[in-house]
Amino acid sequence: MDYSLNSIEQCLQIMDKMKLMCNEDDDIEIFDEALYKVRTEADMSAIERLCNILDDKTEGPCSAMEDILNTIFYISEKYKQLEQGIYIFLSNSYKMIKYAVDWYEMFHRMVLWTPNLYEYYISAIKRLDKQNLEILLHTLHNIKKEDIEKDNGKNFFEEKVDFIIKSIK
């Protein structure tokens, strides 16, 4: 099948169509080409669409979904709007929790691993409506609960999650 990657909209449509990588016409190389074009040419308006492409049921390499998360950060940073990019992601929590809970959680883990994002993350969280805030807090609680290091029983994310929660109250 011939796919046209002439516009950002076409790229996003192709990615959305192929996100599960379970159809005969789905092609990871085309998906990656479309994502690369979005990454290099899209503006902040593409972030919400990227959130909707994330899906836990993808049969393709998980790197494709991870690349979407990285693209969200990349676009936000490129336009010097990290807080807004994070906010757009977080304000779609109620949608993503239905079909991309693993990738939603991965986004938070990526932020927790990157202390220089905390300021933007905390500011974005403070802007959330109640529904999205509850989902986020539940997710942070799960991350904190699940990540006990096996060697010494210490929770790697506990201090980081506690800091974030304390900072938003």
Language-model features, listed with the residues they occupy:
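Eukaryotic acidic, Ser/Thr-rich intrinsically disordered low-complexity regions
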Residues: 1-13, 26, 122-169
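Alpha-helix capping and inter-helical loop/turn segments
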Residues: 2-6, 37-46, 59, 72-84, ...
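Amphipathic alpha-helical scaffolding segments comprising HEAT/armadillo-like alpha-solenoid repeats
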Residues: 8-12, 43-54, 78-93, 117-123, ...
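Generic hydrophobic, helix-prone segments enriched in Leu/Val/Ile
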Residues: 15, 86-90, 107, 168
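Solenoid-like repeat scaffolds
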Residues: 17-22, 52-60, 90-99, 127-131
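N-terminal interaction modules that seed assembly of large macromolecular complexes
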Residues: 18-73
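Amphipathic alpha-helical elements of HEAT/ARM-like alpha-solenoid repeat scaffolds that form extended
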Residues: 26-38, 65-72, 100-122, 135-144, ...
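Charged low-complexity stretches with an acidic bias
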Residues: 62-103
